[in-house]
Amino acid sequence: NLFQFEKLIKKMTGKSGMLWYSAYGCYCGWGGQGRPKDATDRCCFVHDCCYGKVTGCNPKMDIYTYSVDNGNIVCGGTNPCKKQICECDRAAAICFRDNLKTYDSKTYWKYPKKNCKEESEPC
């Protein structure tokens, strides 16, 4: 669920998901359109696509099982749908970590959605 996603982001990046990723670029936060603006925004685009492939459960609400082993997120549990949600969140948190150096709050934090009008690329 979104609370767990926040925890995974904090674990991987040391940053608050709400404060860093809830209103960034064209895809980080609620909804998404246009083309991703940078590598961080692309993490959110891929995460949105990943959630879009989940069927049979609610990615934003359902609780999944995970652990952290030597700094690595390990998704667990027996429910394949919930495990898929965890894998989406895990991949995004790692993507955020790997792209911290190019995170550009001056340009893309609270980026106007009116600037996200390009045709979206397919997932």
From Swiss-Prot:
Pfam families: Phospholip_A2_1 (PF00068). One of its GO terms (molecular function) is phospholipid binding. Transmembrane segments: none annotated. Ca(2+) binds at residues 27, 29, 31, 48. Keywords: Calcium, Disulfide bond, Hydrolase, Lipid degradation, Lipid metabolism, Lipoprotein, Metal-binding, Palmitate, Secreted. The active site is at 47, 89. GO terms for cellular component: extracellular region. This is Basic phospholipase A2 APP-D49. It is found in: Secreted. Binds 1 Ca(2+) ion per subunit. The keyword Coiled coil does not apply. Changing residue 10 to E: 95% decrease in catalytic efficiency. 500-fold decrease in catalytic efficiency. A lipid is attached at residues 7, 10 (N6-palmitoyl lysine). It catalyses: a 1,2-diacyl-sn-glycero-3-phosphocholine + H2O = a 1-acyl-sn-glycero-3-phosphocholine + a fatty acid + H(+). InterPro entries: PLipase_A2, PLipase_A2_Asp_AS, PLipase_A2_dom, PLipase_A2_dom_sf, PLipase_A2_His_AS. Its cofactor is Ca(2+). PLA2 catalyzes the calcium-dependent hydrolysis of the 2-acyl groups in 3-sn-phosphoglycerides. One of its GO terms (biological process) is lipid catabolic process. Belongs to the phospholipase A2 family. Group II subfamily. D49 sub-subfamily. Disulfide bonds join 26-116, 28-44, 43-95, 49-123, 50-88, 57-81, 75-86. Monomer or homodimer.
